């Protein structure tokens, strides 16, 4: 027997990922077909240093204007001078905030009414109650500007669970700016 005082260094230990009640139980094919839907895009030169970010928001509501179904937030990073509209292309999730990537997401359930996220993340409501939510830690989004001025957004993201689940889908339509 003996004793040791000092640090213990552990290499290659598995990362402990907390299990949450709002984690997806299986892959989610997202749909955007609610009675009331708001699809918008907002730009910012303040989110990332020396870059311009575009956040796409897909928000769905029931007849009483309460959240319903799938809600999605995607944030891409463009050059600082690309402020007129989002630049079409394929954006891979990254935590680097480099131009040409999609921002990795965060999501905290204990903040705000139904939690709060940054970057790329989703929420799913069932009968007005938050059922599932999570942040994108991997995957990609393709942004296409169509000849008629509409956009097609095709995405396949993985959440940050121990056994990651996909949240994916496609949407085509007009994007509005809130201002």
Task: Cite the ranges covered by each PLM segment.
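Intrinsic disorder/low-complexity signal
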Residues: 11, 17, 25-26, 32, ...
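Long, contiguous N-terminal structural blocks used for assembly/anchoring
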Residues: 17-50, 55-57
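Residues at beta-strand starts and edge strands
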Residues: 2, 50-52, 70, 149-151, ...
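Surface-exposed helix/loop patches within compact recognition domains
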Residues: 7, 41-143
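Edge beta-strand at a domain terminus
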Residues: 2-34, 76-80, 137-139, 156-179
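Short, solvent-exposed loop/turn segments that connect beta-strands within catalytic domains
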Residues: 65-67, 148, 162
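A short, structured loop/turn motif at beta-sheet edges
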Residues: 143-151, 179
């Amino acid at each position: 027997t003996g004793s040791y005082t000092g640090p213990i260094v552990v290499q290659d230990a598995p990362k402990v990922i907390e299990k949450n009640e709002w984690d997806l139980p299986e892959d989610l094919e997202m749909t955007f077909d609610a009675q009331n839907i708001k699809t918008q895009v907002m730009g910012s030169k303040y989110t990332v240093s020396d870059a311009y970010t575009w956040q796409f928001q897909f928000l769905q509501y029931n007849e009483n204007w309460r959240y319903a179904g799938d809600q999605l937030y995607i944030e891409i990073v463009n050059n600082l001078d690309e402020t007129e509209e989002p630049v079409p292309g394929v954006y891979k999730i990254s935590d680097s905030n480099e131009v040409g990537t999609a921002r990795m997401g965060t999501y905290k359930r204990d903040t705000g009414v139904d939690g709060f996220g940054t970057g790329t993340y989703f929420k799913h409501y069932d009968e007005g109650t938050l059922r599932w939510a999570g942040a994108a830690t991997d995957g990609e989004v393709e942004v296409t500007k169509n000849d008629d001025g509409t956009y097609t957004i095709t995405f396949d993201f993985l959440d940050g669970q121990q056994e990651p689940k996909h949240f994916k889908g496609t949407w085509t339509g007009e994007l509005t700016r809130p201002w």
